[in-house]
């Protein structure tokens, strides 16, 4: 978030957020799975979105919750003439699928 305080954000700045409402990144990368029960202390269930963040910093904001809306959101994000955020809402289970799709871009 600190980087958004820059008063001269480039118009080609595009941010993609995978929001699974918990911090499930630790289930997608190697290492934390070796911690066993400690993994539950590395997640923080929440109901926050990035929409207010985008409004505060005057960024474009797009959202979606399916692979189809992800593709449409990517098109909007790429075509946007301003610094923008694309927020994809996923479940913990589908988070890995979205992440895999994103890595193929």
Segments (PLM) and residue ranges:
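Thiamine diphosphate
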Residues: 1-105
